[in-house]
């Protein structure tokens, strides 16, 4: 049985347990789709994060032969010729480089007919995941050009500072182009004003699911009086009624996972909507910048856990 084909930039959701807790995490496919068809394998990118239970568990426990449950390739962060320009400016950091690595591999393989300029911002050279691989791919094809930007140190043939409107305009191609941005929540926050200042049509700016982290309590609109509180949530699933604690600084999904409840999650960012649930009573905080619910869902009280 052949593995499912995927588009460069997509991920696969992997389900695994840690004790009684049940997790589903999206892992980016970081290779050309050719590998899944000729080599019958997927390559995923996992970064070990400090104070992160899931990545620490994976690095300590997963090994060759470990059996995992995975869903099909998913996600919308890929080139769509009916929507996107062939000239693409990618913006990323060390949290979001993997989708662009898959795209660059596909460009080098001749599977993806685009011109990709990647603006890659990091603090230091040692933080730049895939840097050597990106440079090697750029030597194989003229259609891929990586630009590295380091804020904390000066590196030969690299930019120094931060990703700004001036820097983007310096490397952006002439004529129309699309902007693809994927990375940490900090990257979105820092670069959004500069992208907005470029006055691109909305359809030409694409955001990946990225790593929104656990800092949503610091976003505009979060009610100050709710900080540090713990709530008792009542959940109805498969005709069963369950009660579980949920902190104000965590998502409903995190609370469900901790109790081992399968919420049918996939993207872990509120993009795909597979974790839809109906809010029967109470209030939830949904950051406007990350709210990707359909109008019909909003009208009928549907939330993404």
Describe these PLM feature segments.
Residues 1-67, 122-124, 150-153:
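Ferredoxin-reductase
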Residues 222-265:
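N-terminal pre-ligand scaffold of iron-sulfur
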Residues 5, 60-63, 245, 266, ...:
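Residue-level "contact hotspot" at macromolecular interaction interfaces
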Residues 2, 57-58, 242, 263, ...:
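Short, conserved secondary-structure segments in the cores of folded domains
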Residues 261-285, 289, 299-305:
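Local cysteine-cluster metal-coordination motifs and their immediate loop/turn environment
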Residues 50-234, 245:
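FNR/FR-type flavoprotein reductase catalytic core
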């Amino acid at each position: 049985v052949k593995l499912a084909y995927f588009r460069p930039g997509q991920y696969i959701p992997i389900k695994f347990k840690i004790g009684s807790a049940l997790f589903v995490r999206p892992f980016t496919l970081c290779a050309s789709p050719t590998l899944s068809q000729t080599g019958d394998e997927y390559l995923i990118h996992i970064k070990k994060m400090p104070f992160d239970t899931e990545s620490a568990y994976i690095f300590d426990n997963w090994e060759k032969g470990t059996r995992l449950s995975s869903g099909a390739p998913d996600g919308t962060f890929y080139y769509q010729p009916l929507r996107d320009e062939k000239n693409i400016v990618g913006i990323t950091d060390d949290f979001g480089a993997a989708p662009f690595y898959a795209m660059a591999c596909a460009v080098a393989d001749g599977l993806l007919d685009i011109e990709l300029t990647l603006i890659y911002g990091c603090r230091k050279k040692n933080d730049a995941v895939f840097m050597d691989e990106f440079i090697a791919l750029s030597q194989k094809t003229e259609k891929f050009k990586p630009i590295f930007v380091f804020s904390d140190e000066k590196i030969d043939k690299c930019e120094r500072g931060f990703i700004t409107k001036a820097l983007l305009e310096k490397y952006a191609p002439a004529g129309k182009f699309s902007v693809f941005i994927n990375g940490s929540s900090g990257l979105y926050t820092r670069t959004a004003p500069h992208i907005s200042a470029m006055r691109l049509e909305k359809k030409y700016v694409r955001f990946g699911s990225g790593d929104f982290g656990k800092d949503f309590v610091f976003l505009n609109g979060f009610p100050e009086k709710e900080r540090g509180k713990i709530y008792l949530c009542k959940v109805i699933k498969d005709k069963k009624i369950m009660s579980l604690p949920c902190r104000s600084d965590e998502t409903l999904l995190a609370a469900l996972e901790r109790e081992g409840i399968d919420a049918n999650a996939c993207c872990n960012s509120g993009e795909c909507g597979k974790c839809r649930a109906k809010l029967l009573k109470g209030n939830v905080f949904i950051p406007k910048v990350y709210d990707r619910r359909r109008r019909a869902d909003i009208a009928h009280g549907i939330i993404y856990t």
